[in-house]
């Protein structure tokens, strides 16, 4: 099982770069197992083995710490659905800051790219959240709208 170093109830969802590596946390309450696969510090991990297993808490959050992980590393989750007949397969991190689709790993099985939370500049310093009653909330999965199929990372500007 992956280390629980730097993991707590307040660990952010998604991948977060911290000193010495990165934390990974995902909500999958019905999963029977969640594994972290990817390329970290030049080493490829592509197995559903005990040493790649994330730890599940009582609320359905799976988490682990990958030592040596850093900016630019690629990752994705392998999720085993609920037993006894659950589906299984690779899943992207819904909190990923960047995705890359390649010939060998096309969308939707593409890799997420580990990026620091401050890697994208925001130009909205004067923004103020409107009253909730004035909001229209939409959820869009950016990877669904990707126009890059040549192995180049997609980003939010691709859907603008």
Feature map (PLM): residue ranges:
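Residue-level detector of conserved, well-ordered beta-strand and adjacent loop positions
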Residues: 27, 37, 55
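Short proline/glycine-enriched turn/loop motifs at strand-loop junctions of beta-rich domains
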Residues: 27-34, 70
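Beta-strand signatures of extracellular beta-sandwich domains
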Residues: 33-37, 76
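The feature marks proteins involved in alpha-glucan
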Residues: 1-19, 23, 44-49, 53-139, ...
């Amino acid at each position: 099982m992956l280390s629980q170093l730097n993991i707590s109830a307040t660990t952010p969802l998604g991948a977060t770069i911290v000193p010495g590596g990165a934390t990974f946390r995902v909500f999958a309450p019905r999963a029977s197992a969640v594994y972290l696969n990817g390329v970290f510090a030049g080493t490829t991990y592509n197995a559903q083995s005990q040493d790649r297993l994330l730890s599940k808490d009582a609320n359905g959050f799976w988490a682990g710490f990958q030592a040596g992980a850093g900016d630019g590393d690629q990752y994705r989750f392998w999720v085993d659905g609920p037993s006894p007949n659950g589906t299984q397969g690779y899943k992207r991190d819904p909190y990923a800051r960047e995705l890359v689709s390649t010939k060998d790993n096309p969308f939707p099985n593409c890799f997420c790219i580990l990026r620091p939370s401050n890697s994208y500049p925001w130009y909205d310093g004067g923004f103020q959240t409107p009253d909730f009653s004035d909001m229209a909330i939409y959820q869009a999965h950016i990877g669904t709208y990707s126009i890059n199929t040549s192995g180049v990372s997609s980003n939010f500007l691709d859907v603008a």
